Amino acid sequence: MTITPQNLIALLPLLIVGLTVVVVMLSIAWRRNHFLNATLSVIGLNAALVSLWFVGQAGAMDVTPLMRVDGFAMLYTGLVLLASLATCTFAYPWLEGYNDNKDEFYLLVLIAALGGILLANANHLASLFLGIELISLPLFGLVGYAFRQKRSLEASIKYTILSAAASSFLLFGMALVYAQSGDLSFVALGKNLGDGMLNEPLLLAGFGLMIVGLGFKLSLVPFHLWTPDVYQGAPAPVSTFLATASKIAIFGVVMRLFLYAPVGDSEAIRVVLAIIAFASIIFGNLMALSQTNIKRLLGYSSISHLGYLLVALIALQTGEMSMEAVGVYLAGYLFSSLGAFGVVSLMSSPYRGPDADSLFSYRGLFWHRPILAAVMTVMMLSLAGIPMTLGFIGKFYVLAVGVQAHLWWLVGAVVVGSAIGLYYYLRVAVSLYLHAPEQPGRDAPSNWQYSAGGIVVLISALLVLVLGVWPQPLISIVRLAMPLM
């Protein structure tokens, strides 16, 4: 197979991020300079984002048997790059107070971003597995980056061991699917899995094991046990990446698998996914009710958000609207999570031991950092799905898709879950406006809005509000990603 200039243009984001990894590695070997390496990383990620315009001009194509570049891949690549950029900008002030090696942080984020881009373009079970490993392995190091803290190290060990187990399930499931179908390409799977084939025990077992592996990576019930501990133990900028980039990339590739291979046509698989979605929505919200740690609360709430997205995935067979729903919901979830975790990162910067993540640290924040408190309020309202925010548009889409596909009990679960979610999100928002404690705890720097992280947080809040009132630009972008399938 010959690689043409057209193919190289299609692979630009992947090549640019890969080149940035090499440049940052050489820069660290040459001389440790925190500012230089952070700047190189941000320039590389921005260049990869800009290159998406050229990719769009090249059109949709299968670059290799493992990768397909089209509108869908571009949308998810863009979301992963935005999340990686935000992670780097939040990490810079946080690392300023960190006494050990700072520069490797950016290297690990870039390698994980590379895995995310590979997942967005994956068109084959081999590239799906490679992408998941490429995004997971750097996260083992990132979660335990504050290794002098017992909690961070414990979170890293938990995540490493459980992630390895999940990967083995995923790989074994792929082996069974291959044994039955004789191919690993998504398109070939779609052709080979004809009538009645999906009821073969070996194939059902294979897809079942794959659901276990992917369910762990997406922290769906009952494979979610690592989520709250890892979110709490990981440094705040890493929790940002975990909650956004890794979830978006993996959900994107699962979406593509379901589009090409008729996995959702099997009644057994649909029932299993529906039960997982129902349990994730209800359990995630109920567990978040009693949390007094913001990162744990956001960890449990992410379980329920993935449950909502699963409703749209189950309804995928009913039409293109569910693809639109997932795109809009993930964009809303990305900006809301970036804002919420960004506030936690700003409150925890520079590094001074554990993050400012207890609810008590945010009590009365409005009285000395009013804009920051307003941003956090907007993010909580968006995550709760209150009208006039982007979170509401996403949730409305999911409900519409559920109704269209007659998934009545899942629609009921979404409504009940949203009602429960409203309580704990508003609890965080209300605590920002209570009387400040006598002895103030951690606080964001007074000039936070002029820092790169502060600007990212403000832009996220602005996007959540503007797109919540006028979502048409976002819907148009998501629709552009559809016809190129």
UniProtKB/Swiss-Prot annotation:
* UniProt GO molecular function: NADH dehydrogenase (ubiquinone) activity; NADH:ubiquinone reductase (non-electrogenic) activity; quinone binding
Q: Which residues lie on this side of the membrane: Periplasmic?
A: 1-7, 56-70, 126, 180-202, 256-270, 318-325, 394-407, 476-485
Does the record's keyword annotation contain Membrane?
yes
The record gives the effect of mutating residue 247 to C as: Shows 7% of the wild-type rate of deamino-NADH oxidase
Question: According to the UniProt record, what happens if one changes residue 224 to K?
Answer: Shows 40% of the wild-type rate of deamino-NADH oxidase. Inhibited by 20-30% upon addition of 0.25 mM of decylubiquinone
Instruction: Write the Enzyme Commission number(s) for this entry.
Output: 7.1.1.-
Instruction: Point out the coiled-coil segments of this chain.
Output: none
Is Acetylation one of the keywords UniProt gives this record? Answer: no
Cellular localisation: Cell inner membrane
Instruction: State the phenotype upon gene disruption.
Output: Cells gene grow very poorly on M65 minimal medium containing acetate but normally on rich medium (LB).
**Any one GO biological process:** electron transport coupled proton transport
The entry's stated outcome for residue 391 to S is: Shows 90% of the wild-type rate of deamino-NADH oxidase
- Report which reactions are catalysed by this protein: a quinone + NADH + 5 H(+)(in) = a quinol + NAD(+) + 4 H(+)(out)
Q: Which NCBIfam families match?
A: NDH_I_N, PRK05777.1-1
Can you state the subunit structure given in the record? Answer: NDH-1 is composed of 13 different subunits. Subunits NuoA, H, J, K, L, M, N constitute the membrane sector of the complex.
* More details: A construct which produces a protein lacking the first amino acids has only 5% of the wild-type rate of deamino-NADH oxidase.
Q: Which PANTHER family match?
A: NADH DEHYDROGENASE
Q: Which family does it belong to?
A: Belongs to the complex I subunit 2 family.
Q: What is this protein called?
A: NADH-quinone oxidoreductase subunit N
Q: Which organism is it from?
A: Escherichia coli (strain K12)
Which gene is transcribed and translated to give this protein?
Answer: nuoN
